[in-house]
């Protein structure tokens, strides 16, 4: 079973070149915070009434104008996300217009709004990939975690329709105490459907939705998160590959340049950006949005230059730079700021989780083998 997407060498080359040149190769447009589900751990979700009380949504004309400006600046890869992007009133016009620009477009969706009519339309402007969230293996779990008593039925139908239409699907699983018992069945579902399933047991604190949630979420304890990280490795990798890990967290085959504890080590703010539903450009979607320039009120290139400068100025905890686990922990700037409220304090939850991994890997090995 493939557990992570395979990135072509040409794509990696483009990212390296764009990082060196400061070109915004990759972008994310967060079209709306509105979602028809209410997942307990979500960092952005608002109801329609909550969204309207804050600000109106930007329309297709504005998003397409932004898309053209981003393309002119070098953007080639684009992720459309939300909330649930299919709930944007002009989502079809947005996707069709961006598709005509020749972009490699991926779409994040919970899958519940994708039916035969939607798939017939998508076949005319197909994304290169649909990233579908899989939150459980039963309608009961979806109701418990997401407040949707028909969620699993809807999502599995969407996945079947997308596959039949020849549209690539990747499954993302956010694992929490509310759906952990379903993990074996979710892995089995992915295997039977020959799909990538990427399991995350670390949940970012939802500080964008509630500033009082620094260091908190509806999530596992650090030790539980480490256990389920190891358990997910066992289920997805298989016995032999799991044992070859010897309790070590796999290191990326092509790690990012830079060093954690120094500056931002990922591509955020170097060759990638995120635009929130209110128009704030940020290095990534987990950063506090009020700090980012508004791309609907200033030229795209000016906003990008500001984000690059702000990102370059970020310095992470020096303790992380000297930590023996830094290459496997990969505590990014977003983790640091959402766990601690600033960039110079160690993200204790993440730190505890990573340092607990070996003992929890041993526990999984003992239980499973």
Regions found by a protein language model. Name each.
Residues 48-57, 144-150, 214-215, 338:
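Short glycine-enriched, charge-decorated loop/helix-capping segments at active-site entrances
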Residues 58, 89, 150, 178-181, ...:
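Residue-level signal for the nucleotide or nucleotide-sugar donor/cofactor binding architecture
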Residues 2-14, 23, 285-369:
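Flexible mid-to-C-terminal extensions adjoining Fe-S/redox cofactors in radical SAM and related proteins
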Residues 1-129, 228:
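Conserved alpha-helical substructure of the radical SAM core
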Residues 38, 74-75, 126, 167-168, ...:
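Short loop/turn motifs at secondary-structure junctions
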Residues 34, 38, 42-45, 269, ...:
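Cys/His-rich metal-chelating microdomains
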């Amino acid at each position: 079973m493939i557990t992570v997407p395979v990135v072509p060498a040409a794509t990696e080359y483009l990212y390296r070149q764009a990082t060196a040149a400061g070109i915004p190769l990759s972008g994310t447009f967060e079209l709306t915070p509105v979602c028809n589900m209410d997942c307990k751990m979500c960092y952005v979700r608002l109801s329609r009434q909550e969204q309207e009380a804050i600000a109106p949504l930007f329309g297709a004309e504005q998003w397409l104008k932004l898309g053209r400006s981003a393309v002119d600046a070098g953007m080639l890869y684009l992720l459309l996300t939300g909330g649930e992007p299919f709930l944007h009133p002009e989502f079809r016009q947005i996707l069709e217009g961006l598709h005509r620009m020749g972009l490699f477009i991926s779409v994040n969706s919970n899958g519940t709004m994708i039916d035969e009519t939607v798939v017939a339309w998508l076949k005319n402007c197909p994304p290169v990939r649909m990233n579908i969230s899989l939150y459980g293996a039963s309608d009961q779990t979806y109701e418990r975690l997401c407040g949707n008593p028909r969620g699993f039925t809807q999502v599995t139908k969407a996945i079947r329709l997308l596959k039949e239409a020849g549209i690539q699907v990747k499954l993302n699983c956010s694992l929490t105490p509310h759906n952990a018992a379903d993990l074996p069945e979710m892995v089995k579902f992915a295997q039977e459907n020959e799909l990538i399933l990427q399991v995350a047991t670390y949940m970012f604190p939802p500080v964008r939705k509630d500033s009082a949630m620094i260091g908190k979420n509806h999530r596992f304890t650090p030790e539980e998160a480490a256990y389920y990280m190891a358990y997910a490795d066992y289920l997805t990798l298989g016995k032999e590959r799991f044992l070859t890990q010897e309790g070590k967290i796999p290191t990326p085959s092509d790690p990012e340049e830079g060093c954690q504890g120094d500056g931002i080590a990922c591509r955020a703010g170097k060759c990638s950006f995120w635009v929130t539903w209110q128009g704030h450009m940020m290095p990534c979607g987990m950063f506090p949005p009020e700090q980012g320039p508004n791309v609907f009120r200033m030229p795209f290139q000016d906003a990008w230059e500001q984000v690059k400068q702000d990102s370059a100025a970020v310095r992470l905890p020096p303790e992380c730079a000297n930590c023996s686990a830094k290459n496997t922990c990969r505590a990014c700037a977003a983790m640091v700021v959402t766990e601690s409220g600033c960039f110079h304090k160690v993200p204790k939850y993440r730190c505890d989780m990573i340092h607990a991994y070996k003992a929890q890997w041993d526990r999984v090995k003992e239980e499973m083998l």
